[in-house]
């Protein structure tokens, strides 16, 4: 069918299209080359104020336009590099690192700064909590560690003070004897007061003790029984042995603690000594705290703050105590009602927790192992990243501190302005508030007065509606329950049928499983046959390509006619550098006209060549037809090729093993040589000399075909034959390793071709070769159409014969007979397709 890209003439299509893939490759190569050769560092000072940054950028662009309007005198060297497209100015102004991207870079920098601020301020609550935890983690750990480190020295200091007091107790007693007369007088006076006041009290207690004596005797009897029970256990039998064992083990424990106490004491003394040396560092903050505390106490006691605080504390304490009394009373009342439900809740929660204990234990074990391993693996990573984190923190701290210092005055001015505006607005609104409150009060009173008489009536009406709806519930329930009761017997009648269906399906499973296995085996055989047929089809196409060699030779003459035109183009391009200077002054006027002429010339050229291309295509098609009929000695290619297609599948099985086996052997030998070279450290380039990536790909395809054949043989071996399956699996592993070696070498060669030779290719030669690809594309399209006419592609005779696949038609009387016939057919087909192993 004709379209915008071609014109159909009979059965031959002529298509003229640009080689965009080659253009993209050239463009990518040029851009990469420019990046390697030309680079510039553009300092960008990002202003946090977006408006200021835009204004600076506009001012810079105006200066650039002014300088550009004055004009410049650019010296052009005639001996330019032909491989570089565009001059220095074009690369400077239009390249990726040129001045033309300065505005984009500045805009991007401003956008990134704004995005950083938004991202920093838009953190979620959880993120801020995480940031806070991270921020206080290190100081908190350091504070705790410092306190723990200073604790031994503080304990030593207090212990030393207590020891000194104990040692000087005799002196303290001797000094206290001077106050003994006064102390004795005070004791006598106080004792007299107690004696006078407590004598009646103790007389009453004497009578009480007389009354309580029998009860106290009962308590003493209980205590005696407790002591007897304890003594009976520890003085005889297992109890005595256990007590002896406890004492022995305790003695051993104390004996073993000797080195521990020695080492611990030494460490404690060392730490205490270091702390004592650092006591001087603590005096200054303690003195400062004491002075500040004294000043604070003087202030709050003199200005009435302390008295007000005590009054507020008394009020708060009174409220708390009253609330405690009320809560206790209400709690006791609630406990009397909630005893049973709370007991049920506690028992249920306990049962649930006990049932969940195995699962919770497993989860805890999982989390412990995973998190522990994660921490162990992350520790060296964090250690390696610590210098980077430290540098980043210092850099961010410096940057943020500078930014905040710069923003502080600005924000202060903004806050003062907003404060003044808000104060003025609130002062203006303040006189209006009493009027608004009075208006709302009058409105509410009016609403209550107007709607008050009707609210009880509305409530009564709603109550009647709810009562009527509730009365419908018994009717609905009495109607639905019999209906459900009627459905239950019908549903129950379905249960036996469902049980029979399940039982029947269970009985069918032993029969269905072998059938499914048969289907899987058939699918594997079809896939194997399809892969083999595809390999044969490639060989047939290669033979047909030989028939088309004459056609390609004719096209080669046409390609040769282009060489003189390409040489002229190359000579003309060589003269271009000398003309650049004269053209550059008036570039703006002639570029548009030149572009129009180029496009119009391309259109005219394509139009003038259409008729010639059609004539040439007819001539080539006639040559192809005559070459085929002359080569085969026939006059009806369709009939002969139809017969060839009928016998292709029959001859394929005979020639497959002989034609395909050498390719496999060559691929294996090449992979073995490459493996030896890689193991010995020898450069494999000498082994791959003369071998292209296409040939390596063909070798990989041959090895893949061999792997599939061995896989089919392995699947045919019973699982009980472990030795045979292991031997075939070893062959499969070896073929996989050989394929990996060939794939690696193919990728290496391809990368060398792409990245080593790309920089040295002449773009003009590539453009000329792209133009010369047109006749080759024409030949490919003609050959593909010719194959379609022969019935080899699409819905042709040979393709139909190939895609028919393999069918099994059985005339059987039992499933066992079908399985036996299927096994015999598969064995025959495997021998005819892949040969004997």
UniProtKB/Swiss-Prot annotation:
It comes from the Viruses. InterPro entries: ARM-like (IPR011989), ARM-type_fold (IPR016024). Signal peptide: none annotated. This is Minor tail protein Gp26. The lineage of its organism: Viruses, Duplodnaviria, Heunggongvirae, Uroviricota, Caudoviricetes.
């Amino acid at each position: 069918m004709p379209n915008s890209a071609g014109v159909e003439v009979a059965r031959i299509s002529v298509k003229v299209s640009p080689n965009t893939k080659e253009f993209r490759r050239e463009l990518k190569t040029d851009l990469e080359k420019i990046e390697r050769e030309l680079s510039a560092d553009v300092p960008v000072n990002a202003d946090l104020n977006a408006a200021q940054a835009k204004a600076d950028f506009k001012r810079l662009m105006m200066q650039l336009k002014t300088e550009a309007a004055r004009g410049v005198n650019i010296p052009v060297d005639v001996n330019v590099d032909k491989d570089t497209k565009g001059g220095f100015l074009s690369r400077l102004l239009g390249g990726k690192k040129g001045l033309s991207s300065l505005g984009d870079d500045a805009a991007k920098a401003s956008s990134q700064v704004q995005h950083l601020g938004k991202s920093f301020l838009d953190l979620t609550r959880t993120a801020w909590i995480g940031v806070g935890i991270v921020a206080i983690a290190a100081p908190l750990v350091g504070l705790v560690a410092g306190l723990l480190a200073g604790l031994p020295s503080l304990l030593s200091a207090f212990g030393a003070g207590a020891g000194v007091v104990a040692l000087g107790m005799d002196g303290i007693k001797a000094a206290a004897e001077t106050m003994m007369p006064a102390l004795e007088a005070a004791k006598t006076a106080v004792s007299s007061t107690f004696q006078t006041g407590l004598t009646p009290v103790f007389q009453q207690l004497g009578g009480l003790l007389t009354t309580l004596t029998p009860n106290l005797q009962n308590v003493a009897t209980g205590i005696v029984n407790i002591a007897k029970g304890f003594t009976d256990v520890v003085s005889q039998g297992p109890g005595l042995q256990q007590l002896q064992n406890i004492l022995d083990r305790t003695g051993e424990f104390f004996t073993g603690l000797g080195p521990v106490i020695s080492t611990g004491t030494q460490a404690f003394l060392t730490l205490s000594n270091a702390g004592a040396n650092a006591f001087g560092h603590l005096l200054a903050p303690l003195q400062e705290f004491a002075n500040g505390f004294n000043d604070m106490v003087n202030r709050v006691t003199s200005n009435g703050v302390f008295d007000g605080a005590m009054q507020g504390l008394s009020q708060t304490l009174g409220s708390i105590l009253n609330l405690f009394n009320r809560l206790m009373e209400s709690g006791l009342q609630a406990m009397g009602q909630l005893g049973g439900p709370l007991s049920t809740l506690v028992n249920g929660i306990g049962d649930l927790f006990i049932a969940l204990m195995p699962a919770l234990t497993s989860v805890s074990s999982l989390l412990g192992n995973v998190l522990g391993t994660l921490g162990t693996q992350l520790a060296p990573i964090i250690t390696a990243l610590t210098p980077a984190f430290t540098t980043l923190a210092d850099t961010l701290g410096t940057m943020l501190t500078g930014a905040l210092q710069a923003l502080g005055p600005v924000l202060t001015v903004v806050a003062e302005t907003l404060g003044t505006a808000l104060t003025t607005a609130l002062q203006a609104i303040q006189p209006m508030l009493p009027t608004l409150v009075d208006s709302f009060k009058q409105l509410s009173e009016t609403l209550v007065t107007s709607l008050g008489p009707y609210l009880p009536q509305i409530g009564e009406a709603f109550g009647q509606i709810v009562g009527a709806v509730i009365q419908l519930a018994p009717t609905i329930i009495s109607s639905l329950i019999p209906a459900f009761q009627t459905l239950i017997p019908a549903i129950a009648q379905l249960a036996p049928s469902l049980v029979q269906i399940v039982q029947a399906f269970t009985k069918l499973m032993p029969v269905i499983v072998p059938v499914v296995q048969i289907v899987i085996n058939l699918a594997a055989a079809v896939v194997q046959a399809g892969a083999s047929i595809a390999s044969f089809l490639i060989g047939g196409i290669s033979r047909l390509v030989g028939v088309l060699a004459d056609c390609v030779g004719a096209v080669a003459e046409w390609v040769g006619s282009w060489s003189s035109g390409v040489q002229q183009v190359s000579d003309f391009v060589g003269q271009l550098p000398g003309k650049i200077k004269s053209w550059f002054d008036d570039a703006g006027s002639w570029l548009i006209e030149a572009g129009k002429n180029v496009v119009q010339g391309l259109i005219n050229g394509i139009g003038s060549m259409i008729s010639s291309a059609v004539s040439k295509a007819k001539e080539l098609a006639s040559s192809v037809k005559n070459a085929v009929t002359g080569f085969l000695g026939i006059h009806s290619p369709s009939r002969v090729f139809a017969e060839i297609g009928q016998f292709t599948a029959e001859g394929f099985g005979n020639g497959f093993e002989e034609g395909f086996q050498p390719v496999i052997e060559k691929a294996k030998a090449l992979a073995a040589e490459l493996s030896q070279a890689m193991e010995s450290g020898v450069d494999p380039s000498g082994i791959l000399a003369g071998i292209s990536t296409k040939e390596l790909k063909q070798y990989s395809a041959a090895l893949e075909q061999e792997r599939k054949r061995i896989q089919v043989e392995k699947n045919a071996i019973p699982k009980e034959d472990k030795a045979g399956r292991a031997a075939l699996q070893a062959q499969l592993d070896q073929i996989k390793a050989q394929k990996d070696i060939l794939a690696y070498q193919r990728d290496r060669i391809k990368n060398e071709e792409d990245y080593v030779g790309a920089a040295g290719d002449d773009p003009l030669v590539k453009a000329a070769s792209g133009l010369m690809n047109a006749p080759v594309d024409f030949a490919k399209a003609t050959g593909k159409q010719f194959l379609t006419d022969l019935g080899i592609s699409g819905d042709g005779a040979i393709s139909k014969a190939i895609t028919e696949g393999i069918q099994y038609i059985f005339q059987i009387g039992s499933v066992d007979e079908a399985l036996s016939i299927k096994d015999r057919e598969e064995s025959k087909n495997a021998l005819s397709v892949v040969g004997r192993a």
